[in-house]
Amino acid sequence: MNLDRHISMPQITWVVGTLLGLAMAVFLGSAVGGQDFARVSLVLGAFIGIGAFLALGKNYWMLIPLSLGASFPAIPLGGRAIEFPELAIAGCSAIFAARIATRKEKLVVFRSVNVPILLFSAWVGMVYAMYPVGFAMFGSAQGGGRFYLKLGLAFAAFLILSSRTYSERDIKWIFGFLIFGAAFTLVYDFSSVALGAPVIDQTTGMVQEGFYTWHQTLSAPALTIVFLISAKWSPREIWSLQRPWLLAVYVVCFLMVLMSGKRMALAALFMAPLVSAIMFRQYVYIFVGLGVALAATGTLVVGQGQWFTLPLVAQRTLSWLPGNWDPEFDNIAGGADDFRKELRFIATELIKHHPLIGRGFAVDIRETATAIMVADRGGGIDIQVAAFALGRSWHNRWLGYSADFGIPLSVMQSIIYVAVLLMCVRCFGYSGSRKWFGVFALYLFIFTTRDIMASHTSGHTSIDAWQRWWMYGLLVSLYVQMLKEKTGMRVLTSHQGTARSTSKDITWASKH
């Protein structure tokens, strides 16, 4: 039999794709007929994922900020709930490895700006080797090896994004993903509430009840938008009403944060314009921002209980200030917090027993038994504290890192913060807001400042890295690009100076 040797690769691809499509159609049809919807969703998800990677091509890395910028629903896989970012980063890692093997990309690991992240990761790896957790735990929704998995994927995302170079258009796409993520998260959470689905805490797995439940999700999208506004436009542009819609958006974000119940989020909302005024060197707007913040909060605090009654969740946001609040907030009035106090006590005890190394995310039977006894003892705070302690959500970054992995890890995290802030300052000083590189640098500076502000009330050794290291990797790449540009400009200036000097010498010699 003679075969046509002129069959092209696209023709082969179409034939193979058609055959696979027909086979998959039969498979899906039988699954739907058998009402095996878990298998249907799994297959459709796989096709969508593969299609996304093929469509993006060399821009496959965009799936990392896209997946981490929004709260996508978990994907059922093998009887376990797998988060979309976990699959996205795993897929990106596989493609990155393949492109390294084919010399289309380079992996850059050992350079000075990577040292803080490398030290952090090496320390976590050492503790894991000393106190390992079985691989079966990767199926857990919270705790144990799932946190190690997230740290490993966060490190992979950092390496992938820090080893690339970016254009202005790439950074604009990233901000587009962040805005999309903020909008999607709002719509998804509101839809879940409207459909009656229970709100599950992502750290403990507990169902949240009461007035302070889904409201918490309002703060993250609002802060994303406010941080972007403060990074892209100077205070003069905002307050001079050159773009009046910016102030309108800020007011909407203020109301969202107020209704979120997040006390520290309100402080971050007012912090962003102040940092922007300092970075843009428009210092007069520091006082303008402070005046507006005092007027807004003062009106709400003074008016509460006299002129109007705020919703309970809004009162919670302001409860750290002295005011006429509902008795519901007696235990947290003035900044007091019995819940965090109990968590800090447990974390401090762990640090006393394991000050240098800690035991990582390993959970033994004694901790589980203690949590059960605490829950059986009675009070609502006791039940919450037990679940959060097992989930390593200490609500204090420094105590939490030290309790999990020893005091040295807290020191390493502080070094990471300093390194990130310094790189942000240098990148913004070089690019300013005229380039999206500078906008991202200032955005991350504000974001990191918020992290430091809230370090005594929030934080998780694994989740922090999971949500932030991809941004650190992007910053490292932009910082290295900036250094190369500055070096190139100095070399060019030096050559031009040498050429002018040589030209003058020739002219002088010709005259004499």
What are these regions (language model features)?
Residues D4-T102, M126-V133:
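N-terminal signal-anchor transmembrane segment
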Residues M259-S260, A277-I332, E349-H353, F361:
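A membrane-periplasm/extracellular boundary helix in multi-pass inner-membrane enzymes
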Residues M1-P10, V16, L241, R426-A441, ...:
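A juxtamembrane structural motif centered on a specific transmembrane helix
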Residues A248-V251, R392-N396, A403, S414-I416, ...:
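Loop-to-helix entry and N-terminal half of a specific, functionally important transmembrane alpha helix
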Residues I82-S93, S112-A129, A136-S163, W173, ...:
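Aromatic-anchored transmembrane helix interface
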Residues V199, D330-F345, E349-H353, I357-F405, ...:
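Long extracytoplasmic/lumenal interhelical loops at the membrane interface
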Residues F27-V40, L77-A88, Y212-Q216, P244-Y285, ...:
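Helix-loop-helix junctions and helix-breaking kinks within/between transmembrane helices
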